[in-house]
């Protein structure tokens, strides 16, 4: 199989953090989750229930014969590939549960996420376990290419190469924000200066908050590393979904679950450690960046820290500054991220303050402010956050 071996290198200023938070430089151990349907199975059980990819793959090459990459991250490289997937053929599971069926054409382009190094093998296997649970929970899991959904469709895991196969969606929210920001600078006017640089910002915010609510309440997982680079955009195809009441022309879908864990796994003991991969200033919540948090032996990322990360992702989409704190170094961003609840104060003093909306408490500012409350317990749940859009 073409994906069995890769030796070649998607993150921005990412801090790698181990499950026990002993140092910032050591990579995490294997993520093992102790919750399946609110039970605590033995570790060998946690290794099951993974959707397996049963089809052949061929990695795409450019004119020079090099593999074509969609992107790179802390643990992995994402390659462009093609696969012949028989129409209606079900994906295989490592355990008996019923399998989603992929409605396919003869050949399609897919994304193949492969480990960069040996210690990433367990990280990707754990991500495959998370994505298999997501796929089995999704109402669109039986037809993963249709519109809707909240997560990039997962086609399966390849055990021989520790690779994940997903729907190919080359456009990230971060790239879209940068494109929109460039266009906004070229066409700046007093008529539009109070609008977010990303068109249909409200629709984007609604999609992502609904998706986060679904992940937290229906699937029962924390994403752990939400940022513009970990949201992919899929163009909507049906005419009825376009130009309809100012809705987004894209489905905004979460990707990269290498730092995800089940919410109930935070009560795990030392027998069932939870692995978390990366924290990305400025999107990491301040409580995750304290010295005591780094030394903690328990789960750090929570639904509340996901809310914070999404709030700053939406702030970036409004201002056009993908890293929020424009013109700062990585060390400066880290220092400012430790007081991330002040992010709006920084933006208000900068060139893009008008993008928050008219007045000090403009619409964008109001939405973001709720999500970046200093104390985690003061932040709304995703469902409560949606009330702003009612």
Residue ranges and their predicted role:
Residues 288-356:
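Conserved C-lobe activation region of Hanks-type protein kinase-like domains
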Residues 2-69:
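Juxta-kinase regulatory segment immediately upstream of eukaryotic protein kinase catalytic domains
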Residues 229-283:
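Activation segment/activation loop of eukaryotic-type protein kinase catalytic domains
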Residues 152-196:
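Conserved structural core of kinase catalytic domains
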Residues 136-157:
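Conserved HxN/HPN-centered segment at the entrance to the catalytic loop
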Residues 74-136, 140-141:
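ATP-binding glycine-rich loop module of kinase domains
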Residues 204-205:
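Activation segment signature within eukaryotic-like protein kinase domains
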Residues 372-384:
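A conserved short helix/loop substructure at the end of the activation segment
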């Amino acid at each position: 199989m073409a994906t069995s071996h890769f030796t070649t290198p998607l993150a921005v200023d990412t801090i790698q953090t181990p499950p026990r938070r002993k140092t910032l430089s050591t990579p995490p151990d294997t993520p093992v989750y102790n919750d399946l349907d609110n039970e605590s199975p033995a570790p060998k059980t946690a290794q099951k229930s993974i959707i397996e990819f049963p089809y052949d793959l061929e990695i795409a090459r450019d004119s020079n014969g090099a593999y074509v990459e969609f992107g790179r991250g802390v643990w992995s490289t994402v390659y462009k590939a093609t696969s012949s997937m028989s129409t209606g053929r079900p994906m295989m599971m490592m355990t008996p549960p019923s399998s989603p069926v992929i409605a396919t054409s003869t050949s399609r382009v897919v994304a193949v996420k492969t480990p960069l190094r040996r210690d990433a093998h367990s990280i990707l296997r754990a991500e495959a376990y998370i994505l298999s649970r997501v796929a089995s929970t999704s109402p669109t899991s039986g037809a993963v290419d249709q519109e809707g959904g909240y997560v990039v469709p997962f086609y399966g895991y390849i055990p021989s190469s520790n690779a994940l196969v997903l729907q190919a969606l080359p456009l990230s929210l971060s790239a879209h924000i940068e494109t929109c920001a460039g266009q906004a600078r070229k066409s700046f006017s007093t008529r539009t200066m109070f609008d977010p640089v990303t068109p249909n910002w409200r629709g984007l915010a609604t999609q992502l908050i609904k998706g986060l609510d679904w992940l937290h309440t229906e699937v029962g997982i924390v994403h752990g590393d939400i940022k513009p680079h970990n949201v992919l955009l899929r163009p909507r195809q049906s005419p009825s979904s376009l130009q309809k009441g100012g809705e987004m022309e894209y489905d905004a879908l979460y990707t990269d679950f290498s730092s995800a864990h089940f919410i109930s796994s935070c009560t795990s003991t030392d027998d069932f450690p939870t692995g978390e991969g990366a924290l990305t200033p400025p999107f990491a919540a301040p409580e995750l960046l304290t010295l005591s948090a780094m030394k903690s032996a328990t789960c750090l990322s929570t639904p509340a820290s996901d809310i914070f990360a999404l709030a700053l992702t939406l702030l970036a989409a409004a201002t056009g500054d993908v890293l929020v704190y424009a013109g700062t170094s990585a060390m400066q961003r880290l220092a400012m991220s430790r007081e991330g609840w002040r992010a709006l104060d920084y933006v208000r003093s900068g060139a893009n303050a008008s993008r928050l909306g008219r007045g000090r408490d403009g619409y964008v500012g109001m939405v973001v402010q709720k999500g970046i409350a200093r104390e985690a317990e003061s932040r709304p749940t995703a469902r409560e956050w949606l009330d702003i859009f009612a």
